[in-house]
């Protein structure tokens, strides 16, 4: 039997884009990257674990903020080069800016307009004890 991870078309850096969506509403919460290890751990631990390109290490979503993403379902697109994680976003905040979604800006009249409110001050999110 073929290893399920071998079916994924990893990019030249060994990564695949991963889109997190709210499992109830379908709203796109964020996009991050996964490597083979992070995807395998996500499936095993049933929580989102990404690969941080800037830090060069595994990133367990919510490890600093407490805003864990509980995995409900993993999906692979038709070209096998994008993953969707259907998640329950604990704390209802996916973005490091304190918003529900990282996609909080809308293109309007030639500029990006902020349309979603900050739910919690990022300084309060990332202070000790969340």
UniProtKB/Swiss-Prot annotation:
Pfam families, per database record: PRA-CH
Main location: cytoplasm
Entry's localization field: Cytoplasm
Cofactor(s) named in the record: Mg(2+); Zn(2+)
Keyword Protease attributed: no
Positions with a binding annotation for Mg(2+): 77, 79, 81
Protein name: Phosphoribosyl-AMP cyclohydrolase
GN (gene name): hisI
